């Protein structure tokens, strides 16, 4: 797309949607040999494309396809880690992608995506610095959405899936 570098296009690589199929054993994923090879080809292209887009300066946002077996709805932080590990992002770039860039892609950056006077009061309060370890995002102390606080949010977690992903991404 010749307009991509001019701000008309954005990429949301969604690496967490495919990577588990290539990293977890077939005894866990229950995919066939053909599906595994196809997954490796697709995921290789996803990772390569994300890295190339990042190097070219394209607008890159963050998404997860959270309805998939190995993509829990509470684990967006893993997608940020994958962007850092696989696509050449720094932690600050990954955090900007999931906040300001996502808001810009969706056309709501005048209302949210950064902390500014007049914008919606949307923020996380964490117990550690995510620039040191993105996993600090896993257990926020406080979520404020449109000015409404939620202390120590506790989504239902899937310990078995979390353990598999911890091992796969180690």
List each model region and its residues.
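Short amphipathic alpha-helical segments and helix-helix/interface helices
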Residues: 1-3, 50
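Extracytoplasmic/secreted cell-surface and envelope-processing proteins
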Residues: 1, 21, 70-73, 135
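Long, low-complexity intrinsically disordered regions
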Residues: 169-170
């Amino acid at each position: 797309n010749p307009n991509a570098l001019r701000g008309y296009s954005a990429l949301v690589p969604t690496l967490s949607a495919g990577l588990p199929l290539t990293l977890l054993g077939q005894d866990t994923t229950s995919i066939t040999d053909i599906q595994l090879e196809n997954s490796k080809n697709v995921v290789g292209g996803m990772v390569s494309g994300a890295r190339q887009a990042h190097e070219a300066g394209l607008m890159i946002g963050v998404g997860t396809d959270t309805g998939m077996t190995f993509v829990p709805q509470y684990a967006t932080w893993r997608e940020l880690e994958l962007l850092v590990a696989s696509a050449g992002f720094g932690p600050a770039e990954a955090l900007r992608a999931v906040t300001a860039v996502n808001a810009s892609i969706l056309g709501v950056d005048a209302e949210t995506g950064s902390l500014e006077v007049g914008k919606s009061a949307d923020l996380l309060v964490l117990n550690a610095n995510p620039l040191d370890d993105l996993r600090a995002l896993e257990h926020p102390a406080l979520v404020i959405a449109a000015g409404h606080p939620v202390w120590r949010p506790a989504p239902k977690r899937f310990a078995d899936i979390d353990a598999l992903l911890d091992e796969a991404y180690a």
